[in-house]
Amino acid sequence: MSEFNNRPRLVLLPAVDVADGKAVRLTQGAAGSETSYGDPVDAAAEWADAGAEWIHLVDLDAAFGRGDNRGLLKRVIRQTKGVKIELSGGIRDDDSLEHALEIGATRVNLGTAALENPEWASHVIGQYGEAIAVGLDVRGTTLAARGWTREGGDLWQVLERLEEAGCARYVVTDVTKDGALKGPNLDLLRQVVERTERPVVASGGIASLDDIAALRELVSLGVEGAIVGKALYSGAFTLPEALDVAGH
């Protein structure tokens, strides 16, 4: 056990996905597959109280282009002082990006905009540096855009372009794994970290403490952290248990 404890730690980001004012989880990113878990402010406060250093906060309505939850996101961030927030969903222009940073997001994930508006993405990557991550949402090696409803190009071509732009960090999601509780796509993560020196955050599929241990094995290769969603909400394990396995 001591050998395991000497390994570098994996940063865990409990997820709070917001749709129609409620904390929800989707299955494979599909609109209409929501399971509701109540008030997002309460959910975020619960993870903060349980020891979270980061929360991955997602505005699903903004991601799907059906309005937004800006006021509610601001409340979530205000109620979780001391916890760093990675904010995602519908960040597609200067207004949405600046608003996310103004309300207290530590880091903002670009998704669709990085695929559909590469010049703008390159500009803000250069301007904001570490405050920008790019979400690479993948089916096979094809990227998914617009709330995962459209194809967004070849993963490796887009990654090469983002590397040239100086992207500071990538959040890699296997869409087929997300919310399915079937384990993360370790092979995909290994392939991505082989192609970048930048840190990678893994997302999608974590179902057990063994999955967290397996992801921790990849930290030395470049996997910095992991987003944990449905497994926490469904009670597969507690956040303190997960943080312990992750090395906190």
Swiss-Prot record:
<dbReference type="GO" id="GO:0000105">
    <property type="term" value="P:L-histidine biosynthetic process"/>
</dbReference>
<protein>
    <recommendedName>
        <fullName>1-(5-phosphoribosyl)-5-[(5-phosphoribosylamino)methylideneamino] imidazole-4-carboxamide isomerase</fullName>
        <ecNumber>5.3.1.16</ecNumber>
    </recommendedName>
</protein>
<dbReference type="InterPro" id="IPR006062">
    <property type="entry name" value="His_biosynth"/>
</dbReference>
<dbReference type="GO" id="GO:0005737">
    <property type="term" value="C:cytoplasm"/>
</dbReference>
<dbReference type="InterPro" id="IPR010188">
    <property type="entry name" value="HisA/PriA_Actinobacteria"/>
</dbReference>
<keyword id="KW-0963">Cytoplasm</keyword>
<comment type="similarity">
    <text>Belongs to the HisA/HisF family.</text>
</comment>
<dbReference type="InterPro" id="IPR044524">
    <property type="entry name" value="Isoase_HisA-like"/>
</dbReference>
<keyword id="KW-0028">Amino-acid biosynthesis</keyword>
<feature type="active site" description="Proton acceptor">
    <location>
        <position position="17"/>
    </location>
</feature>
<dbReference type="InterPro" id="IPR023016">
    <property type="entry name" value="Isoase_HisA-like_bact"/>
</dbReference>
<feature type="active site" description="Proton donor">
    <location>
        <position position="137"/>
    </location>
</feature>
<dbReference type="InterPro" id="IPR011060">
    <property type="entry name" value="RibuloseP-bd_barrel"/>
</dbReference>
<dbReference type="Pfam" id="PF00977">
    <property type="entry name" value="His_biosynth"/>
</dbReference>
<dbReference type="GO" id="GO:0004640">
    <property type="term" value="F:phosphoribosylanthranilate isomerase activity"/>
</dbReference>
<keyword id="KW-0413">Isomerase</keyword>
<keyword id="KW-0368">Histidine biosynthesis</keyword>
<dbReference type="GO" id="GO:0003949">
    <property type="term" value="F:1-(5-phosphoribosyl)-5-[(5-phosphoribosylamino)methylideneamino]imidazole-4-carboxamide isomerase activity"/>
</dbReference>
<dbReference type="InterPro" id="IPR013785">
    <property type="entry name" value="Aldolase_TIM"/>
</dbReference>
<comment type="pathway">
    <text>Amino-acid biosynthesis; L-histidine biosynthesis; L-histidine from 5-phospho-alpha-D-ribose 1-diphosphate: step 4/9.</text>
</comment>
<dbReference type="GO" id="GO:0000162">
    <property type="term" value="P:L-tryptophan biosynthetic process"/>
</dbReference>
